[in-house]
Amino acid sequence: MALTGTDRVKRGMAEMQKGGVIMDVVNAEQAKIAEAAGAVAVMALERVPADIRAAGGVARMADPTVIEEVMNAVSIPVMAKVRIGHYVEARVLEALGVDYIDESEVLTPADEEFHIDKRQFTVPFVCGCRDLGEAARRIAEGASMLRTKGEPGTGNIVEAVRHMRKVNAQIRKVVNMSEDELVAEAKQLGAPVEVLREIKRLGRLPVVNFAAGGVATPADAALMMHLGADGVFVGSGIFKSENPEKYARAIVEATTHYEDYELIAHLSKGLGGAMRGIDIATLLPEHRMQERGW
């Protein structure tokens, strides 16, 4: 029996990226820098989150020409983003042959009621989450990989830390629940009880959970790995820094060797300025991308 497109295959593809760094790129040149630095995959888009935030307006799926340019430039997997709920954008990316689709809050949501039914696709999906309720709902919809939402395009790690800690704390709580407590918790979280039962049985999420949204330095990446991340997405942090090549290599090394503090200290020397960050407290509620999705 062919397993193409099954949860087993799609989750297995995501597992292969575990321990690695996935970098946002906007052209072939950046994609080659990411691959040379050791990225396990790249996310092809027209603008990094910091530029999307600055430009405002409606952010949509990237021009397929940009995505194909990146796909032709590198041998590592290529991801691309679609708007939340935009089934047709996802079908277009699947037709292009991308390796993963990110149903992303970085783009302007297309549907304020429904996320994409990811079970209908052969290509695996990655989705963001802030808590176990969001994580479980995305898994039930067919997500093969999760990531913290953080606050994209800010260079501020605080929200990614908050989301990773919250998900892991809620997992620990679920693991110790009785069946009746589990049913009540599912109702409280708005989560399918079947997914919570699987989490309880495994003692963890059934899919990998990467850190994303605010990673800007090697130390940020190492911190998220310490908190239990399975890997790291870096959006604006690399190509909005003063020295993208150095930052890319340093973040990859810090993610792999996140317990080697002497190495991280060495990696952090002479990098040049990190991307200019934003204090989350200064963002108006309507400018907080993490609030998108349900």
UniProtKB/Swiss-Prot annotation:
It is an enzyme of class 4 (lyase). GO terms for biological process: amino acid metabolic process; pyridoxal phosphate biosynthetic process; pyridoxine biosynthetic process. Its EC number is 4.3.3.6. Signal peptide: none annotated. It catalyses: aldehydo-D-ribose 5-phosphate + D-glyceraldehyde 3-phosphate + L-glutamine = pyridoxal 5'-phosphate + L-glutamate + phosphate + 3 H2O + H(+). Keywords: Lyase, Pyridoxal phosphate, Schiff base. Homohexamer and homododecamer. In the presence of PdxT, forms a dodecamer of heterodimers. Belongs to the PdxS/SNZ family. This is Pyridoxal 5'-phosphate synthase subunit PdxS.
